[in-house]
Amino acid sequence: MSSAVMTHPVRLVQARELAERLGLDGLALDPEPDGPPSAMRTAMVAWAAADSAASHHLVVQDDVSAPENLVALVGRAAGRFPDEALVYYTNWHARNGGASRLAALAGAAWVRAVPDEFTPSLAVCLPLGTADDFRAFAAGSDERHDDELFSVFFRARGRMSLIAVPNVVEHIGTSSINGHATQGIRLAVCPTDAADAEPLLARGRVLEEPGWIPYMRYGEGYIRLVGQENGPDGGRGHHRWLDALPMTGLTERAVREAVAEGMPADLATQVAERFGPAFAEELWIHCLLLGRQAAEAARRLGDPGSPGEVPPDVLARLRDAAVSTAGPAGLPPERRPEAGPDEVRLMSAFAWTAVRAGEQWSPA
């Protein structure tokens, strides 16, 4: 497997340190550093750096942290899934983040990306032929976001990327050369250490179709519906959970009854005191729906397998990681800095009550 770090001269020192620490092959510099911001321009250099003798090529962006054995982890996963485009980071507030969170709760370690959102591109490994095809596809494009063009490319091929649910790659900082700073703090949906990631990536189950996906953005709950990519807007619109309920088979009455019966007043009050009552209710309903869908996905996945597969404690920590990010990810970007360790623990405890209620929920 060959590799490269995408970077810009303003981050050259940071990129060199990352490449040296991870044992990556070299740097892919923006060929027009004084031009308009364009991740795609640098991505073309990075994917062109693939070694023709390699079977796969890994491209990592410069604003990440990752374990020293990242190349080994990625290489083993590429051996397991030799024909797949593999993605190793997912934003905690994206639709694909919602898919990853749902997959973690269902007991899966990989999930198929949704077709109506960008493909997270902080750390991507492609088979060499796919990398060549992507470069040919992207040549001459006016798109400046490589993550957006990846999704257009994968949709055209009829197969989206495969996302690693345990995130060993983490985004660092809030600055953005490509204009994403307004999104605020952007972190991994399921932060996982390398020791836990190894059995998950090597032997964990794959969730190909998560069904409808609950996710939060700007303090509100939404649902990504099955097949919404076929809509007139390509599925890029956002459906509030209440508007989307009729397409899920659930009713508002059933949701309100579950809230009345299961939402703990003490924790709800504490979350409301810090972030407002509307956010507290939205977070609990979001996690209720998440628990419901995770239970459905777990049933479709079936028995987790023999004890020699992924250790139960590793799967439990992955579930904890997924729930721990639900609260801060759901906050509006300007309020995420208010979520310190105490607030994260509070929101996590609150979210777990909803997830467990959803997992046991049998709406009439």
PLM features per residue range, with description:
Residues 1-60, 64-364:
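Peripheral/terminal regions associated with large enzymatic or DNA-binding modules
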